[in-house]
Amino acid sequence: KLNPTAPFLDLREGEIDTLLQNTARRSERWRKMRVAGENEETIWASFKKPVPMEVFSWKGDRDTIMTPLDSIRYYKHFLRASMMSMNPLTGHVKAWVGGFNYKHFQFDQVYQGRRQIGSTFKPFLYATAIDQLRLSPCDILPDALFCIEPMMHGNVDAWCPKNSGNKYGQMRTLKNALANSVNTVSARLMDKVGPRPVINLARKMGITSYLPRVPSIALGTPDISLFEMVGAYSTFANKGIYVKPIMISRIEDKNGTVLFEVVPETTDVLSEESAYVTVDLLKGVTESGSGIRLRHQGADEANYAYKNVVTGYPYQFQNPIAGKTGTTQNQSDGWFMGMVPNLVTGVWVGGDDRAVHFEDIAFGQGATMALPIWAMYMRGAYEIPELGISLEDFEAPEKLTIPIDCQQETPINGLNKENKKEDLEGLGF
């Protein structure tokens, strides 16, 4: 109510007019009038003329009178959300929610929608580093400002990403760095492996959207669909094997004769060990990182009333969960990818346009926008034992050579405690 350009932020009226006009040109009303042979002047006149219409509201459809152009702006006020859930072992899609009301919002955000994915892309980078460099979740890297030099890895200018809140200065294990989405550590990993292997891995995991060969993909700058992301994350849960999502397993006639049956399309992508170590990293997100709200009330509960902000909080899950939050620039998109051994579920929340976003990171982060949907969905799924959703831990490989227990003084990458620092320096860190 206090924003005169609502629901947009950081836009001038002229920019808003352009945005609304572009949306109008993509509308069904515009398409039908063009097919009918109407010229632009006539079409624009119709968009500015008040007419009776039925519009969506959270209290049910309501009849009103407004111009079609005003109705476009009205609908921009609503946050959109989508969710997809699949069994990573079979590829069978268990749930698909492309939006909250198909009658008024005829767009499938799961398959058609492509949005910046933020830090949910980081596991592809970490998995590449683990697979190529044999890094352990316990390896320690400096959390300090780091730049990839100009003309390196496809970059024209120097790339010097900053951490959220501009906080630096400590050494972090890989597990802690991913759990807390530390950008400087991601930059160091990207400098070591380069964008090409990360892109190659993402492609094998079912990512078909455009991925620029530049270091900044480490922070999730590409636009990718939720459909692609859920399929890709399933590779981690399925011991490194990608299974293409399946919506229809078979078709039978009225007599039960099978007319069509899908043969799952699978690709060996990662070693079982690399996939498991990546899953172990992602478990850290819900144990001590940005997804800890799934477990218990936050440490800063006394200073910030999450119950007034996050629906259904606290959730108090006790079982092993691997996951990753994602938040994009200006809090325009909130993501949460969550995994248990036999179910991978992804959630995206955001405005129809990136100019519709939260001002405050507390409201606009993936842990606030998307994680609650995942939590309430999973809580409901666990209340139905017949679904068989796993409460167990992810199965470890028979031979695990990469240390994952960071509480033990186990040699890391075959090195003892004394020469561990020298080894990391030898790798270029």
Question: Where are the language model's segments positioned?
Answer:
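Secondary-structure transition/capping motifs at alpha-helix termini
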Residues: 88, 103, 130-139, 208-210, ...
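Mid-domain, small-residue-enriched loop/turn segments at the edges of structured enzyme/sensor domains
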Residues: 155-160, 192-231
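Extracellular glycan-interaction surfaces
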Residues: 127
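Short polybasic/polar patches that bind polyanions
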Residues: 130, 191, 203, 237
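Short active-site loop at a secondary-structure junction
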Residues: 75-81, 104-124, 138-140, 171-172, ...
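A penicillin-recognizing enzyme superfamily signal
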Residues: 1-87, 92, 96, 102-107, ...
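Conserved catalytic neighborhood of penicillin-recognizing serine enzymes
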Residues: 135-198, 242, 252-283
